[in-house]
Amino acid sequence: NGNKLALTVGGVRAYNQENLFSKKSPEKFKVFIGFKNMVCTNLCISTDGLADQIRVNSLNQLSEAVENLLRQYDRIKHLGMMERMSRFELTQAQFAHFIGKLRMYQFMDKSEQRQCFPVSLNDSQINTVVKNYYHDPNFSCKGDGTINMWRLYNLFTEANKSSYIDNNFERNVNAYDLTNNLVNSLQNRTGNWFLHN
């Protein structure tokens, strides 16, 4: 869509996973590499761009873990997958159906959820996606109600900004994977519970 992207590396120390009462134990970190959309500062993180379980006892171990992440990350593939998103779209009726299924997913039995693609957006984030479908200055739907998957993905990542940092990166990756799951279904004309009855 012509949005300027900047390669970005970042991370946080996962204090939420620390046992503050124990003696010295490995420190935990989450590190990512991906792209920042300069239009809106949304992070675009792919599955191979996240290391969310780094446990280290030294700075050298942390450095080694980050270097491993940087080596395994395929930025060309990541860019290609995001570019592919712009070639597929949902009609307004498909979008409405999808939003309804997202809302239903949250209340399904766990056994039923396991049969669907996992979704980590919560109800308030889904509301944000719907609001921004109409009103986002950069990623709203077209006049006829259609929305391409790049725009939808950015609505997900925008809504994800309300997540606490301890699960922000994982939800960001889930948004990327969910969008690509939908694109695969559209491209291959295969069934998808979120898109079809």
Language model segments and positions:
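Intrinsically disordered, low-complexity regions enriched in serine/threonine
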Residues: G2-N197
